[in-house]
Amino acid sequence: MNLLLLAMGLILPRRPHALHMGPGDPNFDEKLVKGKWFSVALASNEPKFIAKDTDMKFFIHKIQVTPESLQFHFHRKVRGMCVPTMMTAHKTKKKFQYTVNHSGHKTIFLEKVDPKHFVIFCAHSMKHGKETVVVTLFSRTPTVSPDVMWMFKKYCKTHGIHTSNIVDLTQTDRCLHARH
């Protein structure tokens, strides 16, 4: 019996959702992530989500916080045009965890946060038995310091994403001209 409990203790922490601790402060006020943001980096274990000409890239404009959800206001490139869109992530019973039903069920985790400078979100989705992980880095300014980018890359590595699957979005058209 003790061996079984030990085995379970070694297996359970390896589940992807067990990797999510949220912001360092358990009393962090989610309202602090509201406001204007810029997409700075994107990473995924699935290369199609970060490909150069994919329609799957979303560029953040702002985040609104309600008692029940986070509302992400994005621009998305569709055939070269910047199209505004909104996605609502509904709060769950677990702190800093949200769900989205957009192209399938996704679980989004609010991870590392410095509300005056950056925020990292990590999304997990399961389709046909395969898990996809997408990690985004948003900044209050169009770019981030090398230290923040290093921390983002380190975070991605701990979630099984190779550095070749991390894209610096500051070198792409992020639909900045379409922001209001």
UniProtKB/Swiss-Prot annotation:
PANTHER family: LIPOCALIN, UTEROCALIN. Residues 1-18 form the signal peptide. Pfam families: Lipocalin. Glycans are attached at N101. Transmembrane segments: none annotated. Keywords: Disulfide bond, Glycoprotein, Secreted, Signal, Transport. The keyword Transport applies. Belongs to the calycin superfamily. Lipocalin family. GO terms for cellular component: extracellular space. Disulfide bonds join C82-C175. Coiled coil: none annotated. It comes from the Eukaryota. Binds fatty acids and retinol. Is specialized for the preattachment embryo. May be important to maintain the pregnancy and may transport small hydrophobic ligands from mother to the developing embryo. This is Uterocalin.
